[in-house]
């Protein structure tokens, strides 16, 4: 992508309405634009990041055996009345009526709808286990939306729902998602710590929040430092291995970890002082096992191997991509801008032409741009007429992991400069060497 043809409306000044770093940087870089309170348009730069986040989520959900579908944003009130949650849910649920005066709602969550889909088609234990997921917009009418897309009214969610014959099967489904979430966040450059959580309005008796540490986090968290060194489940993880996944779950829940809402000061105090970690954190995922809460209320049953009807056991598993993007920024930035982890950066490499219009610079930039593109890189070529200092500032601000800097002096010697955005390390080498180095490191 040539920057001269890309839509990236960068703000020169920090927006006054932004309270936290991620909100400020997302507005400044032109990732998002606020349309009204808590409602945002994702502009091209932000959409590229969001798409890469969603791609990783999909890959790990599919790897774990979950199957994607897509449910609508509007739901019938009848399903919620059947489950008993229509009146119990607060004012954050947007209730509307269609032209036939039928009560509808803009879905804040999807337990009722997915249970209705399941009971309509699945009648036998032979069709279990089953895990269905979708990535869809939701709406919750927050009293005070704030922090940009971190806490907005309309937001994107990945919701997965598992169905099993009994609790043992449901716990295995829970452990699958537990391991999948660890892998998902790790691939985005995050160390997410699972913490026992309150089940809230979703219900159930087993729940974990996945928290990343960030100075501006909304929650105060307390945990053992061992979490910072635990191994992440590998790409070869066998999601059908009941014992293996239980081992992963047991390891990651063997140390103390809690947010302030669930904190036990006595249990935390029993940890050696040097092994305690107290910090701020941001929730990036939440998983629940809620047993038969919805299936019992809505008659979701299957015939078991004994020929009798069994009410299925369910779980739900959520990740908010539009919340995850600012959370990553909160955890990975410096005074100059965003530092994107490689897997989710809007572009893999930015080629900076310090003197657009110079024949040698244009030719070298064109070669790097073309060759890296053919090798599968997402490349941004800054071919604008902006001064060099402004180009460097823009590259740092938007956080592309690698910068290839092409200037008249260096290219006269057949060389370019390669800069690592995260470390600031710079290396001068030939054009061919730079291309080969980046391709080899991919």
UniProtKB/Swiss-Prot annotation:
InterPro entries (UniProt xref): aa-tRNA-synt_IIb (IPR002314), aa-tRNA-synth_II (IPR006195), aa-tRNA-synth_II/BPL/LPL (IPR045864), Anticodon-bd (IPR004154), Anticodon-bd_dom_sf (IPR036621), Pro-tRNA-ligase_IIa (IPR002316), Pro-tRNA-synth_IIa_bac-type (IPR004500), Pro-tRNA_synthetase (IPR050062)
Domain of life of the source: Bacteria
GO BP annotations, alphabetical order: prolyl-tRNA aminoacylation
Keywords: Aminoacyl-tRNA synthetase, ATP-binding, Cytoplasm, Ligase, Nucleotide-binding, Protein biosynthesis
Lipid biosynthesis recorded as keyword: no
Keyword Mitochondrion included in the entry's annotation: no
Purpose of the protein: Catalyzes the attachment of proline to tRNA(Pro) in a two-step reaction: proline is first activated by ATP to form Pro-AMP and then transferred to the acceptor end of tRNA(Pro).
Subunit organization: Homodimer.
Family: Belongs to the class-II aminoacyl-tRNA synthetase family. ProS type 2 subfamily.
HAMAP family documented for this protein: Pro_tRNA_synth_type2 (MF_01570)
Name the record gives this protein: Proline--tRNA ligase
Native source organism of the sequence: Rhizobium meliloti (strain 1021)
